[in-house]
Amino acid sequence: MAASASASALQAERCLLVGVGAGPRRHRLPLRMPPPLHAPPALLLLPHRRRRRWPPAVRASPGEGGGGGGGGGGGGGLAGALEKRPVMSALTVVVMNMRVLEIGVVAWSLATAIIPAVAGFMPGLVLSRILVGIGEGVSPSAATDLIARSIPVQERSRAVAVVFGGLSFGSVLGLLFAPPIIQNLGWESVFYIFGLLGIIWCLGFQSLKEQQLRGNEDIQVIQDLGQSPSGSSDLISSSVSPKSSESSLGELMNSLKDVPWREFFKSKAVWAMIYAHFCGSWGHYTCLSWLPTFFSEELDLNLTEAAWVSVLPPLGSMIITSIAAPFADNLISNGVDTTKVRKICQTIAFLSPATFMMLSSVDLGVPPWEIVAFLTSGLALSSFALSGLYCTHQDISREYASILLGITNTVGAVPGIVGVALTGYLLDTTHSWSISLFAPSIFFYLTGTAVWLAFASSEPQEFSKSEPESS
């Protein structure tokens, strides 16, 4: 439930700002759409992901500073999360990840709830967005670490799909329920409600954690008696350990020093994940930020129609994810090499949107609803990445999965700032959707596919820290 309410809050923000699009074309805000995006119910409130942020700034005319400002205003929350992710992800390896997840959800839930109170006070508003960025920066990595340590590889795709699929579900809920809530209770109520949902989730999660800790103690008693139960008790112990929850600050700092950062960047597989995450995020953020404007301007849909069309990609993602995850797990269970499965899924996730964007960027003389169907299908099929890239961090290292996600997620946040702004600038300069929106995304999808097929690997890697050479 946690990821869903945060994704829903993003939709609420978008609903509040949708009326701005009624002005002249060059001063219109891109109508926001949620990440499909990014712990099972927790990420129902979190946009992965991703990453709730205000809609990009208005595309300025050349005399007002150029279109480059088109996305600059959207980077506040992203920038806050971006610079915190690698270090915050490292914390999840040392401090009990359930506790980190709770802290993250509490942080951005409270930060969301106080937005109405600080809306007219810029420093307070900026602080709230920073808190949202910090809270969201740790949540996906904490969830990833829990999956890596407690879910076997044959079930990993479904676990990731359930966790990160909450983002799409939350986006759909937000688009459906935010407008009537705003209409009947006022815009402030949306932020109060979604903040409260996060706190309620934390209370329920605390109860669940205590139950698991008690169960873990029972397992330990059985093991001490020499009656080790069959199954994955070792995995449970590694993810739910009272000792890990009591890590001191000194242990935390020492553990951060022990993280083999240099070894990460010596791995071709890690670099493949970094570039793939960047490429996927470029297409994701730029398309989902600007497609509603494209629907409105290029396909002559009115604002209401464009807003309703925006629910289709996350809805399609939910459907595709429910198919892709069992497909990947079944292949692995039947003996297909894990690396091959991850490459197949990620290739589908990249080539599908690239193909449909190519079809949408040329004049085929098809009606608008077919263009909408093309783009919706492509973006929905990109959810195969949850069984590709998003499982690979855990495949190659259970111990450092959360940090690896933090690294790739940091790079993946850059297109949300740079790509959205660049799209606005190119659109003002060229007046071409094909050049400004589709061509860059197609380029990154194709090059991302090539790099992924060449260098990606799901083989477990030992990232032992290199000893300094003695003089």
UniProtKB/Swiss-Prot annotation:
Any idea where this protein resides?
Answer: Plastid, Chloroplast membrane
User: Which portions of the chain have biased composition (kind: Low complexity)?
Assistant: 228-247
The alphabetical list of record keywords is: Chloroplast, Ion transport, Membrane, Plastid, Transit peptide, Transmembrane, Transmembrane helix, Transport
Q: Where is the signal peptide?
A: none
Q: According to the UniProt record, which cysteines are disulfide-bonded? A: none
User: Can you name a GO cellular component term?
Assistant: chloroplast membrane
Q: State where composition is biased (Gly residues).
A: 63-76
- Region spans: Disordered: 56-76, 226-247
Q: SUPFAM superfamilies under this entry?
A: MFS general substrate transporter (SSF103473)
- Output the Pfam families linked to this UniProt entry: MFS_1 (PF07690)
Tell me the Gene Ontology biological-process terms attached to this UniProt entry: monoatomic ion transport
> Membrane among the record's keywords?
yes
> What's the protein's topology in the membrane?
Multi-pass membrane protein
Top-rank taxon: Eukaryota
Q: Where is the transit peptide?
A: 1-59
Recorded GO molecular functions are: transmembrane transporter activity
InterPro entries reported for this sequence? MFS, MFS_dom, MFS_Na/Anion_cotransporter, MFS_trans_sf
Residues annotated as transmembrane: 62-82, 103-123, 162-182, 185-205, 270-290, 307-327, 348-368, 371-391, 403-423, 435-455
Q: Which family does it belong to?
A: Belongs to the major facilitator superfamily. Sodium/anion cotransporter (TC 2.A.1.14) family.
**What does this gene product do?**
Probable anion transporter.
- Indicate what this protein is called per its UniProt record: Probable anion transporter 5, chloroplastic
Q: Which organism is it from?
A: Oryza sativa subsp. japonica (Rice)
Recite the lineage of the species.
Eukaryota, Viridiplantae, Streptophyta, Embryophyta, Tracheophyta
The protein's gene is named PHT4;5
